[in-house]
Amino acid sequence: MALLDVKELSVHFGDKKTPFKAVDRISYQVAQGEVLGIVGESGSGKSVSSLAIMGLIDHPGRVSAESLQFENTDLLTLESKAKRQLIGADVAMIFQDPMTSLNPAYTVGFQIMEALKTHEGGTKKARKDRTLELLKLVGIPDPESRIDVYPHQLSGGMSQRVMIAMAIACRPKLLIADEPTTALDVTIQAQIMELLLELQKKECMSLILITHDLALVAEAAERIIVMYAGQIVEEGTAKDIFREPKHPYTQALLRSLPEFAEGKSRLESLQGVVPGKYDRPTGCLLNPRCPYATEYCRQVEPQLHHIGSRKVKCHTPLNEQGNPVEYQGA
């Protein structure tokens, strides 16, 4: 049984007459101990979908779903008190920018201990001991003195380590890492990812890794979901997707990598931008940017269908040579 089972999740912003679908009917599962990568450009709905799972979408956002099952609990119908006990304990999240996620008015030790107090209680000494253990676990040197420093006294890399310590404080079963290395330099990025994956294996956590960095997700994830304009356009194992992308958008993302541009003077890029509220096309949402789009693509929205072990949302999925082929059904 899946640890997390998301069915037909949507997130709308704006008024009910003209809502904007930031997330549009996505469904996926995460198994116990699995590392799932969610990739896509900025504006694809990656972060918003995870904030919806965490219950962090405020007005004017509206969340709807057939179900949001964590273990045997539906997060959508869970009463507020029970949800507060579950979110942050069994399900935790690391946010993009540690410098804005930590409260500048409190020491890092206080903030970690506050999370422990909220979810686990215990004595003040036990909470402090656990905080010191966590700071040491995430590789912060001299935790006995760092426990009393404020966020502005730490570097970006150290602040992100504090965020990781706070997220894993209550030993979550599912950890969502939203662009955990975006604000960090390349060397620190590698250290943070190595730490996250080491902790994931040690604690047997499930990990959802949200990123636009395909090289990063290739090394870390077992399975990948590709999102575009709030929709899932492709899903499969990391090996399959990198070896043989089926969706034109996935192909375009991969072709933008330096590894795929050997012998070329310029990297390939996908022209245009992710559509917003007022420029969403009919039919396939990628059709204004897709080099393979047909008149049928411009009129009819494709469904997410199975091609072998893969799921692809395209009328003309790509073959082994990277050329479009009309979909003939399962």
UniProtKB/Swiss-Prot annotation:
It catalyses: a dipeptide(out) + ATP + H2O = a dipeptide(in) + ADP + phosphate + H(+). GO terms for biological process: peptide transport; protein transport. InterPro entries: AAA+_ATPase, ABC_Ni/Peptide_Import, ABC_transporter-like_ATP-bd, ABC_transporter-like_CS, Oligopep_ABC_C, P-loop_NTPase. The keyword Endoplasmic reticulum does not apply. Keywords: ATP-binding, Cell inner membrane, Cell membrane, Membrane, Nucleotide-binding, Peptide transport, Protein transport, Translocase, Transport. Its EC number is 7.4.2.9. It is found in: Cell inner membrane. Pfam families: ABC_tran, oligo_HPY. Its main location: membrane. Residues 6-254 form the ABC transporter domain. One of its GO terms (molecular function) is ATP hydrolysis activity. It is a peripheral membrane protein. ATP binds at residues 40-47. One of its GO terms (cellular component) is plasma membrane. Belongs to the ABC transporter superfamily. NCBIfam families: oligo_HPY (TIGR01727), PRK11022.1 (NF008246). Part of the ABC transporter DppBCDF involved in dipeptide transport. Responsible for energy coupling to the transport system. This is Dipeptide transport ATP-binding protein DppD. The lineage of its organism: Bacteria, Pseudomonadati, Pseudomonadota, Gammaproteobacteria, Pasteurellales.
